[in-house]
Amino acid sequence: MRRGIGIQAAQKQTQTQKQLQNVSEQLNTENINKIKEQLLVFKENLEIFATKHKKDIIKNPEFRKYFQDMCNMIGVDPLASNKGFWCQVLGVGDFYYTLGVQIIEICLKYRSSNGGLMEMDTLAEHLRKLRGKNSQEISCDDIECSISKLKVLGNGFNIIKVSGGKKLVQSVPCELNKDHTDIIILAQDNNASITQSLVISKLKWSEERINNVINFLLQESMIWIDEQSNETIYWFPSLWSNFSFE
């Protein structure tokens, strides 16, 4: 008798679990549908907002960044295609793709001098000169947005964060590991240069580890050698502030 009660209890428990699972699946489906409806409404409102504030989005970099952030919230990419609503209303696709071409042009022009590394602010300055005074104003956010689209071309373009909130634009198809970026950050804090003794003192690295990084950076033409002092100095021209290679 007890065994029968046990079987009935187990069956009832299984049935209850199935009912709870069905209710859970139903709730999940309803929640997903509600979220989809909300996103659709948000997208429609975003299109109305874009139409209403078209001039501000096109002319004001900060407003354009705000608009881009709103798009990212709902997974809308106004730069994904040169066709469709966003490009027709705002022309943002053409704007960022044109900016991307100009970024490539400048990075290629100075690659032999800086080894494919350039400070973001320096790149922005070159872009403003190239575009002219009467062109649409750009910001570093615009540059980052364009570079994110250039990644479809491969690993040639990347953004490296260094100390002091500064950023470097990498335009060479090589992968920089943590050792490479640690050296760059150290150089950025030391007037754009490093020495072997400085690296040993600050990073506690072995000579072999230092030489491996230096040889790689030399091979990629990212650093220059200065042997005029008692100890060899390695300079990063990409970190020289307000330096022009023209």
UniProtKB/Swiss-Prot annotation:
Q: Which GO terms describe its cellular component?
A: ESCRT II complex
The gene name reads snf8
- Which superkingdom, per the lineage? Eukaryota
Q: InterPro entries, from UniProt? A: ESCRT-2_cplx_Snf8, Snf8/Vps36, WH-like_DNA-bd_sf, WH_DNA-bd_sf
What are the BP-aspect GO terms? protein targeting; protein transport to vacuole involved in ubiquitin-dependent protein catabolic process via the multivesicular body sorting pathway
Q: What is the organism of origin for this protein?
A: Dictyostelium discoideum (Social amoeba)
Coiled-coil stretches are: 8-34
How does it sit in the bilayer?
Peripheral membrane protein
Q: Does the keyword Electron transport apply?
A: no
- For the keyword Transport, the answer is yes
Q: Where in the cell is it found?
A: Cytoplasm; Endosome membrane
Question: One Pfam annotation, family name?
Answer: EAP30
What lineage is on file?
A: Eukaryota, Amoebozoa, Evosea, Eumycetozoa, Dictyostelia
* Keyword line: Coiled coil, Cytoplasm, Endosome, Membrane, Protein transport, Transport
Name by which UniProt lists this protein: Vacuolar-sorting protein SNF8
The record's comment on protein family reads:
Belongs to the SNF8 family.
